[in-house]
Amino acid sequence: MFDDCLIMAGGSGTRLWPASSSRLPKQFLPAAEKVSFFSMALERALALTGADGRVIIIAGKSHIPHVIADAAKLSAVEKKRLLVIGEPAAKNTAPAIACAVSLSLLRGRERNMLVLTSDHIIKPLKVFKEDAGLAAASAGGGKLAVFGIPPAHPETGYGYIETGNAAGGVYNVSAFHEKPDLQTAKKYAANRHFFWNSGMFAFNAGFMEEQFRLLAPQVYLPFEKLKKPSPEDFPSCRGVKVLSAWRGLEGAYRKTTGISFDYAIVEKCEKTVMIRANFDWIDIGNWEEYVKIRSKGGSEVFSVSAEGCYVDSDIPVALAGVEDLIVIIRSGKNGGPPSALITRRGQTQKVREIVEQIKDRGRKDLL
């Protein structure tokens, strides 16, 4: 279906602090049983690329061990289809996609590419593959396809896509809208022409090169000058190829402009269409939502008259006479400073404010 699939596995992910941090971002946390969000993205990527297809994974250099740990669980045949690239610096999503496009072009301009996020739950896979088929057809027809999610409720944390006419599940895009305030989000959610922007895309490599040159040359041109990687640039780590010494990559990242793919390309492209998602899409954006998919935390808990509490701790915890608490504790024994979060159910969105307070006090080491 797709020749190349890019999984964007960067980002620090502090919405699930302190379990998620710059050292262990959300995508590497367990989403179900012992399977991480990233592992689920790997499964999707492998299912949507052919036997000769390639899965490109771009993550921060410090997160490569987490990528390898999950990828090592795959079969030998599946691992051969992976290529891991460590970003020298965090420059947002446009440079990551530009880097992947430049790499894909080395194999041909007609290669269809799929861009996936690494921290969402998407199911069932069969339905996602059907929707991705529409995206692949649109990409093959010289379009940039973005997956739009029908809003389940008013949401202020996502950008919105406003659509026009539709044909066979493919919608014309009228406009993109920034993350709204609550009143505006309510209006969007009540309007059948508005969808959440999923951050997942499909396009043809040659077409996207043209769009970068036209709309964001300052992002793409530094990657254009990269030479074709040589065999010694691909050392294997536990059976997975890691492009760790691609000559010129660090220089390209120094010269490129840090900007999101949405701002640089998607919102300016005149050939953007939207694929309406028929699959379930869950963005675990706070502890309240995470607790719903995790029956219990990995903790030794002692409790007396404690009801409706969730504990995720690497040290024993005792609860007495409390209810509806979410308790997250990291002792620091597995790396990073000790930290703890205690919040009441229904108040977990305030973790954002806690994170900002930590930054304001100069304690970014906690994040």
Task: Give residue spans per PLM region.
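Left-handed beta-helix
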Residues: 207-367
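Conserved N-terminal catalytic core of the sugar/cofactor nucleotidyltransferase
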Residues: 1-7, 15-25, 30-117, 123, ...
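Conserved beta-loop-beta/alpha segment of the NTase-like Rossmann-fold superfamily
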Residues: 79-167, 202-203, 210-216
